[in-house]
Amino acid sequence: MKYLNLVFVLQLLISIKYASFGRAFSLFEDDTTFANLDKQLKLPQNTQQTLKLDRLNHDDPLFTTFISSMDKDYSLRLRTVDPSKLGIDTVKQWSGYMDYKDSKHFFYWFFESRNDPADDPIILWLNGGPGCSSFTGLLFELGPSSIGADMKPIHNPYSWNNNASMIFLEQPLGVGFSYGDEKVSSTKLAGKDAYIFLELFFEAFPHLRSNDFHIAGESYAGHYIPQIAHEIVVKNPERTFNLTSVMIGNGITDPLIQADYYEPMACGKGGYHPVLSSEECEKMSKAAGRCRRLNKLCYASKSSLPCIVATAYCDSALLEPYINTGLNVYDIRGPCEDNSTDGMCYTGLRYVDQYMNFPEVQETLGSDVHNYSGCDNDVFTGFLFTGDGSKPFQQYIAELLNHNIPVLIYAGDKDYICNWLGNHAWSNELEWINKRRYQRRMLRPWVSKETGEELGQVKNYGPFTFLRIYDAGHMVPYDQPEASLEMVNSWISGNRAFSDLSTLENAS
């Protein structure tokens, strides 16, 4: 999840014609004010932007094209990736695009399981941002290899494709190698595109339709995944593939509740010492109340404006004091690795960008564009100006649970921006049919079956599980690769409670 710079926040507020926070927030007593403000603001009616392409290869003979049986305007381009050329993994791989006419093109890279690809589960992985490529997950966190300083792949023995086949989809439109005439600037639209991609994928790989299928991701995927799951389960009951479960790591799903937990995390109540002064903590605590009121207006309104202002205020009041400490927003234990101020924070992410811009890499994968960037600021800004970041998506998690579809919310406990306290809180307050039974469960130790070490804390009732992972930041697989792999292997094997399977986990 990217964060706003305070200067940008102030520019945003100035752009909506109010000279100070005080003047802006005096308007929030009555939600009807927003109806008039929408007309005054001159907010972008279409924040989507055109992407300049370096080249097109729709007619590349190395691609096989599958036309959708649902809608002939959609197709899937597919090419085999020679494992020996890039050395990311020795397993079978495919890459390509989902195309909608000539206006939308979504890039993906698919790796078979290292174990039993015919029968092992399929996992779709999504990174966040909004606007960040899922190749961050592939080449920095949980994929078959990472990229070293010498631009050569480093084998990852803890890759999630040890026991599952992995799809890495670059979405929404405009991210990474994905491109189009217009860019998507809302989670709702992104969810529709992702669902259509999945239908096409399983048309191209029909032998995998009966396999377990999971959607996993982190950060802003806490928005994406609930929306995609809603598209699958509720809006498309005639789907041709299974949805077995979803997994969200350090996500932003219920911003109203999660915003209340920035001050506790920064001020020593999340298992780490305070990083702000008592005066700053008191000021942040007061600001949290105003943030809560703004988020409530966002939740209640059909207008984007209250959500835009809620994002601007909450980020400036609850993120900026922390950012000013110089600490990494993704890991409270220290500053960014290279003392960067651009939000990248990890040198390895720069290696991924450099690697993906090598002509031989792009040629092997069949990318239509040359200018790869791990995070796209235009996409991020587009989502900002629809207020998408402050909108709620936890209701779709409840929907899944009420359909008895398992949900795992996991969180590294050293992250600040989507911290474990906030994720634990919203999952505890979620309105679903077994809320009270879930609430009565207490966090208990999660102990490794491999080493006997306590890796974190877990809480489970029925299909719903919350998992705190010790000593991991925003990107759990990066900080705790062994624990991350044990987590995903346990989950996809059906051990939703992360316990001795002889334990009666669902007793009320």
Predicted feature residues:
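Terminal and linker regions of secretory-pathway proteins
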Residues: K2-S508
